[in-house]
């Protein structure tokens, strides 16, 4: 995060929706995919239920950005131009034994 060229902080108003976590997660996923389609590197940095030193990550970020108490931190999406692109995994490299069909 420290060296990211850009970061998007995604917060949700817990007083407006009981599904704010899901809404924020969908927004994060869509931005993550869009960045990739544009050739921009991105990384999902989980913020909710995480700690930063002596306080929660949410408290740490809130102190710096000043968002209201009813808004809760979901995550931070960092953006930048990637140095290199990792090759995709081949199908035979994937742990297919972890896939269950119809029953666990």
Each language-model region and where it sits:
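Acidic, surface-exposed loops and disordered segments
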Residues: 1-104
């Amino acid at each position: 995060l420290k060296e990211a060229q850009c970061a998007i902080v995604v917060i949700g108003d817990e007083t407006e929706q009981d599904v704010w976590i899901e809404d924020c997660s969908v927004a994060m996923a869509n931005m993550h995919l869009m960045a990739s389609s544009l050739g921009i590197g991105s990384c999902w940095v989980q913020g909710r239920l995480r700690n930063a030193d002596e306080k929660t990550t949410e408290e740490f970020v809130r102190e710096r950005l000043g968002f209201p108490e009813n808004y809760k931190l979901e995550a931070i999406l960092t953006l930048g131009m990637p140095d290199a692109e990792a090759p995709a995994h081949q199908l035979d490299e994937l742990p297919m034994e972890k896939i269950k069909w119809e029953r666990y």
